[in-house]
Protein backbone atom coordinates (compact mmCIF):
# COMPACT_ATOMS: atom_id res chain seq x y z
CA UNK A 1 0.00 0.00 0.00
CA UNK A 2 2.88 2.36 0.75
CA UNK A 3 4.44 1.69 -2.64
CA UNK A 4 1.14 2.48 -4.35
CA UNK A 5 0.82 5.76 -2.46
CA UNK A 6 4.41 6.73 -3.28
CA UNK A 7 3.92 5.96 -6.96
CA UNK A 8 0.74 8.06 -7.08
CA UNK A 9 2.46 10.98 -5.35
CA UNK A 10 5.44 10.77 -7.71
CA UNK A 11 3.19 10.80 -10.79
CA UNK A 12 1.19 13.77 -9.48
CA UNK A 13 4.37 15.68 -8.63
CA UNK A 14 5.79 14.89 -12.09
CA UNK A 15 2.72 16.27 -13.86
CA UNK A 16 2.69 19.41 -11.70
CA UNK A 17 6.38 20.02 -12.42
CA UNK A 18 5.85 19.56 -16.17
CA UNK A 19 2.85 21.90 -16.11
CA UNK A 20 4.70 24.63 -14.20
CA UNK A 21 7.81 24.31 -16.38
CA UNK A 22 5.78 24.41 -19.59
CA UNK A 23 3.81 27.42 -18.38
CA UNK A 24 6.98 29.36 -17.56
CA UNK A 25 8.85 28.32 -20.71
CA UNK A 26 5.99 29.12 -23.09
CA UNK A 27 5.39 32.58 -21.62
CA UNK A 28 8.56 34.64 -22.23
CA UNK A 29 6.67 37.78 -23.30
CA UNK A 30 5.21 38.29 -19.81
CA UNK A 31 8.65 38.01 -18.19
CA UNK A 32 10.81 40.73 -19.81
CA UNK A 33 13.19 40.73 -16.84
CA UNK A 34 14.36 37.20 -17.69
CA UNK A 35 14.90 38.23 -21.31
CA UNK A 36 17.05 41.16 -20.15
CA UNK A 37 19.08 38.87 -17.91
CA UNK A 38 19.80 36.52 -20.82
CA UNK A 39 21.36 39.43 -22.72
UniProtKB/Swiss-Prot annotation:
Chief localisation class: membrane
Where does the source fall among the domains of life? Bacteria
Which biological process terms from the Gene Ontology are attached to this UniProt entry? photosynthesis
Pfam families documented for this protein: PsbI
Q: Which residues form a coiled coil?
A: none
Record's keyword terms, sorted: Membrane, Photosynthesis, Photosystem II, Reaction center, Thylakoid, Transmembrane, Transmembrane helix
As for family, the record states: Belongs to the PsbI family.
Cited function: One of the components of the core complex of photosystem II (PSII), required for its stability and/or assembly. PSII is a light-driven water:plastoquinone oxidoreductase that uses light energy to abstract electrons from H(2)O, generating O(2) and a proton gradient subsequently used for ATP formation. It consists of a core antenna complex that captures photons, and an electron transfer chain that converts photonic excitation into a charge separation.
The record's note on quaternary structure and interaction partners says:
PSII is composed of 1 copy each of membrane proteins PsbA, PsbB, PsbC, PsbD, PsbE, PsbF, PsbH, PsbI, PsbJ, PsbK, PsbL, PsbM, PsbT, PsbX, PsbY, Psb30/Ycf12, peripheral proteins PsbO, CyanoQ (PsbQ), PsbU, PsbV and a large number of cofactors. It forms dimeric complexes.
Concerning HAMAP family, the annotation shows: PSII_PsbI
List the protein's name. Answer: Photosystem II reaction center protein I
Amino acid sequence: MLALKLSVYSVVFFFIAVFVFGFLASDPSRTPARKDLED
